[in-house]
Amino acid sequence: MPSTFPGLLLDHAARRPSAPALREKEFGIWQTLTWGELAVLVRAIACGLVEAGLARGQHLVVIGENRPRLYASMLAAQALGAIPVPLYQDAAAAEFVFPMGNAEVGFAIVEDQEQVDKMLEVRASCPQLARIWFDDPRGLRHYGETGLAPLDALIAAGRAYDAQHPGFFAAEVAKTRPADVAAMFYTSGTTGHPKGVVHTHETLIDRAAAGARFDKLTADDEVLAYLPPAWIGQNIFSYAQWLVCGYVVNCPESASTVTIDLKEIGPTYYFAPPRVFEGLLTSVMIRMEDAGRIKRWLFDRAMALARRIGPARMDGRPVGAIDGLRYALGDLLIYAPLRNTLGFSRVRVAYTAGEAIGPDLFTFYRSIGINLKQLYGSTETAVFV
């Protein structure tokens, strides 16, 4: 297995160029980007960045929701030996000043007008920020600030540079070593200024591969990427493990469509903080309160059985034959439809982290056949301890 993220990308592109790598929902329709297409896009962005002046060891800020071209931008920076720095898209402009000054960031690729406005505001305190590119041009037609341009322009410049220097991209990827810095993540800064945590290709790939082996992840898995890319947990599940395993990462249309998109995609590998699992359970209980008496009675009986033997079944412990038959009937009538309603019909492995999850909540999901596990980790340990 290649030992750097750009190396992993090129390996997938060579072995399975037509396999889906990323999907993005746009105007209600899922658009697919294959590994071959992704490699071509990364090559163009990388060549555009070097033509713009990004050098090995310099930092590139990436801000936005989970978007294929932002993922490609991170890969492009890594291919050049530069260091992507994802920052939280919901942060105020003032919150960007410290990390961007601390990392001496001179280049930024952002999602849309909201993030462009923040970068222009930040420039007063971070004069080294020379170039800003944006993915979504809506609302930005009349912006004429120096150094501001659409990502499409960067890609076009990169293609021209690549045509003049055809061996450049491959040579840069070959220079990148496992011990080189792959990304910098900033902590929340609850006790002071945020701390920049540096991870190499080696550390991130090692943690991602270890988790993939433990959970038996393969290229056939599907992930829904909806948490902030600046959080290292999201980066591990939807970036590092994605490149290690070669599975498909699905990017929702917006935060408001995540629940719908979850049901449409039916991910096999899922991560969410406890509040998401709590919200889903609350919605189920509210719906059952409005259900008819017979349906409520069936649900209560089935859940009583599930709480009694479901966790044992999930842990592989034996249960009685009669209880097993009852559970199978409950799965047919209650548990499987419930998993489908939640969007968990295909989930093999589900994780939660960030805070402790209540035992009742934990028991509920494992009782109905969802392999939910508590994850302990930190930014410094690349999620997994």
Regions from the language model: what does each represent?
Residues T32-G36, A182-A208:
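Conserved AMP-binding A3 loop
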Residues A91-V122, I205-L224, A255-Y269, T341:
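Conserved ATP-dependent adenylate/AMP-binding module captured primarily in the ANL superfamily
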Residues L8-L33, L140:
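AMP-dependent adenylate-forming
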Residues I205-E222, P229-Y335, R346, N371:
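Conserved AMP-binding/adenylation subdomain of ANL enzymes
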Residues L10, C47, E51-A52, A79-A157, ...:
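Structural core segment of the AMP-binding/adenylate-forming
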Residues A46, H59, E65-V85, Q89-A93, ...:
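A short helix-loop-beta submotif of the ANL/AMP-binding
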Residues P17-P20, F134, D152, R159-Y186, ...:
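Conserved pre-ATP/AMP-binding loop-to-beta segment of ANL
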Residues L22-R67, Y71-L75, A92-V97, P150-I155, ...:
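Conserved AMP-binding/adenylate-forming core of the ANL superfamily
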